[in-house]
Amino acid sequence: MNKVDKSQINRLRKFIPYAFLFSITLITQNIYLNIETIEWDIASYLIATQDIKLGFLPNETQWESKGPVFIYLYFFLSNFAKGSLVTFKLLNDVILFFTSVFLFELLLKKLDNKIISISGSTLFLLLMGQSWALSGYSELYALFFISLAILIITKFRYSNLHYFYAGISLSIATLINQGTAIFIIPILISEYILNNKKNYFLKIVMMGTGILIPHIVFLIVYSMNNLLDIYFATFLTIPFAYIQAQYANVYELTVFFRELAEINFYVYLSIITLVVLSISNFATSSYLKYKNEFFDLYNQLIFFSLIFYFVGSHNYYHHLIFLLFFIQFLLFKFLNSKQKFFFSVVVLFGLLLNLNTNMEKSLNNLNNLSYIQNEYPLYNLSKEIDSYFQGDYEVLAFDYNLILYYLDKKNYSYIVHPSNHYEEDIIKVLKNLGKLEENYIEKLIDSEPDVIICNPRMIIRGEPVQLNKLFNCEVSDYKKNYVKLDTREYLIDKNLNYYFDPYKEISVFIKR
């Protein structure tokens, strides 16, 4: 074998872990590609991009609770998808794949063991293969940039310039999801412990500059457009009100792991193995090692990811995405090859169980990409709605925002996300800023947009709530110039929702 052949084989070997992770990403993320809606957040984020499409800044005419960079990223990806929800979902798979690659590189840098590193990354992908995680949450986008920043710091610890790049990456994360600013704290603490005062000062100045520049740019842009009030409300006032709601609790965390055990016992056992072996090894450490472990960056990231979940306050599983990523760093605490081997075997069993259960369905979805969107019920409902109009028309949607996405329309309402109409803290802030009027829902309906989409009932924090106290969804009962569409065929379609909601209806009213 000549030198050229050997070099080609070596390059191929380096490529194998990434090809493996990409394959696992596709299989685990596309089990439910044929289901149109798994979570309603994504549809709302897509509609928020209409601001940018129409030449406005994020949150100028369509309000969502996330940072401006997140809305811009959604805009670019949805633009690339050209109205195809299926393509957009696949683009989110690419973001998850690169995030798993960053995790692999971080584990490999510390462990110098490809098998255990690929096992940790595979476990993360298996955890992200659950139904609730198959969406483009802001946490995933932010995690992409946080993990990139940590990888830069880990690989280029002795280059002050790279701390500037890491700061830029961290800044982007906070401009995606405001709460991720909490992950800057463990980096500051860790760097303080690892460096003398001079080096610490230089690195923090470089990183701080990188963090500040993107924020200053957005502050200037929003100030020039007289939108600083809504910018600060979205970044500070409303998130702090959100935190004070205090809905999260330890019990819901145990429910999450119980459900995980029911879905894939070996994935659950992998997490238990990580935690139990790490705690056992940690308990036998000396005082000096205990002190070092306390200030270790990777341990602190796990701790702060738990804080993020509880600060999030609403028991939403997607607030656990950071924990599911950072908990893989417990692999650094394994003391011997037997522990690493046992963990890798358990992850392998979890992977095999997942493939046996889901691979055929995922591959079937991936082989039928051109047909899937045509089977989406809300997509077909949007075509029916559009058939009633020749020119432009306005749509007021209190639910089923995907219809707006398919129609390429902005919402007639300033608030986009359906549940935010019923969050008192949000409504109060937006009213104080003059973004909403008193009884704004009634006034929106009274202004008689061409299409009104609503739902008379909604599950709010686990409880079914009749919405007639806020407004009467049966618009055609009191506005005789509206006709109600028969949407039963769309409502009972098996591809509509992953989570069946017996209380929901699809009420669509067309102005005659």
Range-by-range predicted roles:
Residues L306-F342:
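Hydrophobic/aromatic-rich transmembrane helices and adjacent perimembrane loops
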Residues L90-L111, S119, L148, S280-N281:
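Transmembrane-helix motifs of polytopic, lipid-linked glycan transferases
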Residues S131-Y141, Y316-Y317:
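Short acidic/glycine- and proline-prone juxtamembrane loop motifs at membrane-interface regions
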Residues Y371-L430, Y440-E463:
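Short periplasmic/luminal acceptor-recognition loop of GT-C membrane glycosyltransferases, typified by
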Residues H162-Q178, I184-I189, I213, I302-V311:
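Membrane-interface alpha helices of multi-pass inner-membrane proteins
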Residues F183-L212, F329:
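Perimembrane helix-loop-helix junctions
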Residues K109-L111, S147-Y165, A173, K197-K198, ...:
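Membrane-interface transmembrane helices that cradle and orient dolichyl/undecaprenyl
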Residues L103-L126, L143-F144, D296:
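Transmembrane-helix signature of polytopic, membrane-embedded enzymes
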